[in-house]
């Protein structure tokens, strides 16, 4: 649960992960920054989660338990509608989609625009913030053995030491 003390170090990043409802399914996604830092509402998502029309997707912000032991969260902070800007499927080497929301994210949602890097060096650790099975937001931790994987080294491989991912976690 993201409101347990183990997640304190990642409070900002927790606000950068959202739940997406689309075509009867659920996935996770990240609000991603751009180099202009202008709060353009870009959302990074998994290509295999694309289903139906992105204009009908619903993006839920802050769907998380208010306490460490809770399992319920509010669904009253949401935006409907997006445009697909770019995507690449897993057969061609990636599983990524970039969406732009059709509405700005209200400041009252306290969004955090996560950063990105073009570095080819693996990070020292990886943290997964996601909505497993569409549930309230959870956090998973890795060990320090992050390595480059896949043909051409186009993704990071790691083993979680606490937490796990299941359907619905994809896209975060």
Feature map (PLM): residue ranges:
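Short pre-catalytic strand/loop immediately N-terminal to key active-site residues, enriched for Gly-Thr
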Residues: 160-166
